Regions:
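Mature extracytoplasmic or organellar-lumen-exposed domains after removal of signal/transit peptides
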Residues: 21-426
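Sec-dependent signal peptide recognition
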Residues: 1-4
Length: 426
């Protein structure tokens, strides 16, 4: 049985229109993202299978773009990447993601949810610093990797997914998409429009639906965060782990992993990483509890202002996760740059960390609730440029680049209220 705590929210329930008093109604807030249907007894009202498929497609696309840099790699084309990015059910494709040695409830995308892809959900807004939408950038990057694959000297090495300026395109694609699809859809579409949703009858008046429009749209926002239903039962170390055995679990004991409820994706794992590497932060708890509390208020037809408050907490938490991750990769980039010209120089690592820094910075633009303003982002992109710097320690260019990156950290620290300690050690 799931433990639950009760929170009190003010809900007006008087029959007389002149009755000015509201009654306090206790709304149960479970510790897991689990809610029963108001309409069909014994059924769950939680539904975000489409988001699960998009999390898998996004993760599998990274596996695919990384693959061309591994020993024994096969050359891939832009069509191979688009088969995931613009996925079609007719392809009958199975996910590349595993749960270690544990069987899966479903491994084909269309068995989890039909008609889902990444391309159809990507923001059309121009990317700050690039002047074109993320979809156009992603297509250019697919083509560059495909062209690199034709060069036998590059295929099977990091050069296969790296452009001529040292940009790790596998990382750029992955990080830009988590912003332009997942973060954008969660905050810019679903949370942004949640207060206008209907919350008293079955979705689309369909008697088979177990949820209202507001319940479903909130679930979809949560689905893009990527957390397992029992997210808070995972430690930060598990969420930050490298293997599925750490960040997934057979919670219901059926001997299988259900990607819809028993696996942690993307942003939810980044939150654990930043909590693990920081002090005095609990982004995992802040975000998850806001999603659960907001959903409980919606299910209990509670105060819409309380829904709005939980929406703000969830959106702010996700922004902090992304911003803290930018800080983390600024620190990694600075560490890599300090080794240039020495025996420990590793440009592959520098290219990787720079692209992660840059890609997550792009991701920050997509929330209407953001504290990191477009002006801040323009400054950050101006600092970072469009490729890594290979200036060696001792040069004026190196000193200026280091000073600029430290300024970038300060911008994020002020905007998000990060402690100096965390900005230094993330």
């Amino acid at each position: 049985l799931l433990m639950a705590c009760s929170l009190l929210f003010m809900v007006g329930c008087g029959d007389d229109e002149d009755d000015e008093e509201d009654a306090e109604v206790a709304i149960e807030v479970p510790t897991a993202y689990t809610f029963d249907s108001r309409f069909i007894e014994g059924e769950s009202s939680v539904s975000y299978s489409g988001q699960t498929v998009r999390n898998l497609l996004w993760q599998d696309l990274k596996i695919k773009t990384d693959s061309v840099g591994k020993s024994g790699a096969q050359a891939l084309t832009a069509n191979d990447f688009n088969a995931l990015y613009d996925h079609k059910d007719a392809s009958n494709m199975k996910t590349l993601t595993t749960a270690g040695g544990t069987p899966l409830v479903a491994d084909a995308y269309s068995k989890i949810s039909t008609g889902k892809n990444l391309k159809g959900k990507i923001s059309a807004d121009p990317v700050i610093g690039y002047g074109k939408p993320a979809d156009a950038l992603v297509q250019e990057w697919f083509q560059t990797i495909a062209e690199n694959c034709k060069d036998s000297s590059k295929l099977g090495t990091a050069a296969a997914y790296t452009d001529e300026n040292g940009v790790d395109l596998s990382q750029m694609i992955n990080k830009v998409l988590v912003g332009a699809v997942h973060y954008y859809q969660s905050t810019g579409v679903y949370l942004n429009g949640i207060l206008e949703q209907e919350n008293s009858k079955q979705y689309k008046d369909d008697p088979a639906k177990t949820y209202t429009a507001m319940e479903h749209k909130w679930d979809e926002a949560f689905g893009y965060f990527g957390a397992a239903r029992d997210y808070l039962s995972y430690s930060d170390a598990q969420l930050a782990g490298k293997t599925p055995a750490e960040f997934s679990r057979d919670s219901n004991g059926d001997g299988k992993i259900d990607f819809k409820s028993e696996y942690n994706f993307g942003l939810s794992r980044n939150a654990g990483k930043r909590d693990k590497g920081g002090s005095g932060t609990d982004l995992t708890k802040d975000i998850f509890q806001a999603f659960v509390a907001g959903r409980a208020i919606i299910a209990g037809e509670g105060d819409i202002n309380q829904v709005a408050a939980q929406r703000e907490i969830a959106a702010a938490g996700m922004e902090k996760v992304i911003a803290a991750t930018v800080v983390h990769y600024i620190n990694d980039t600075l560490a890599d740059m300090s080794k240039l010209g020495t025996a420990d120089e590793n440009k592959k690592d520098l290219n990787k960390h720079w692209a992660e820094m840059k890609g997550f910075t792009v991701a920050l633009q997509y929330s209407p609730f953001k504290k990191v303003t477009d002006g801040n982002l323009a400054e950050l992109h101006g600092i970072m440029g469009k490729s890594p710097s290979y200036a060696k320690p001792g040069s004026a260019e190196y000193d200026q680049t280091v000073a600029n990156y430290k300024r970038a950290k300060q911008v994020l620290q002020v905007a998000c209220g990060f402690s100096a300690e965390n900005v230094a050690k993330w």
